[in-house]
Amino acid sequence: MPTAQRAPAALLVRRGGDKLLFDCAEGTQRQLLRSSVGLLELEEVFVTHFHADHVLGLPGMFKTFALRGRELPLRVYGPRGLVDLLGSLKRVVGKLTYDLQLVEVEPGDVLDRDGYRLATFGVAHGVSALGWSLIEATRPGRFDVAAADTLGVPSGPERGALQRGEHVVLPDGRAVKPEDVLGPPRPGRKLVITGDTAPSVEIVEAAWGADVLVTEATFAEEERDRAEETNHQTATQAAEVAQRANVGLLVLTHLSNRYFGPEIAEEARAIFPETIVPRDFDVVEVPYAERGTPHLVKGGASRRREQEVVSSAPQ
């Protein structure tokens, strides 16, 4: 449930120029408008399940896009039942100015993208529901300038080709392979989003080794019975999942309105210290492993923060 300080479920992932919205609760479009992201650049929405606190923002957003004259297609992915659910809202939304594409997916499906893939997995919530993993492709190793100099690889296109994993032939006829000048391959980043769920082996398997696991902690441990009755999990259970999955950072969301956040974070950190409970408009930066660890940027997506950064820049 929303509170005066916290909006319900919606998470935006930005990777390069891609903006991926996971779930869209009531008020999501207003939150986006208040952020540094905005609405019109959204191209894809990924739904975890169809409970009202995860999808009620979709009809209003569809209508707003149309009123703004959007022409760019919008794709919405979700579990089985997506087409029936959103198709039934045509009378509410009215005529659209763009192509709305509804795509149903099953646990185990994979959507390939440029440089990464989105893999779905089953979660335990008592309804048709799934989680999402964003998994980047392995990257070439670091370019060894000294090795390239020793081999006589000239500066320019040849070095660029080797960095892209391509073989090159030098002017004297010698062939140079990428592995001659590149270090070991470097893993990409991995982000896992569960949506609402009870703890399960499937989540541990899907989240194994992830840089970031975003999962729910609807209840504190004292309410474990309530969590089990409603197919949710406690902060303690979420921390145990993160520990078993060997993730880098645990991000807890979907708190009951009886909690403010710090008490949930404290409970989880007793088991898994690398835990945060972000607020609206907070950002979790996920650098490549060689550049650091995932970390919280408070208010990093707020338009106010963006304006402050611009106004403080040297003129």
Model-derived regions, located:
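Metal-dependent catalytic neighborhoods of phosphoester/phosphodiester hydrolases
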Residues: 57-65, 89, 260-269
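Short, surface-exposed connector motifs at secondary-structure boundaries
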Residues: 16, 41-42, 68-73, 244-251
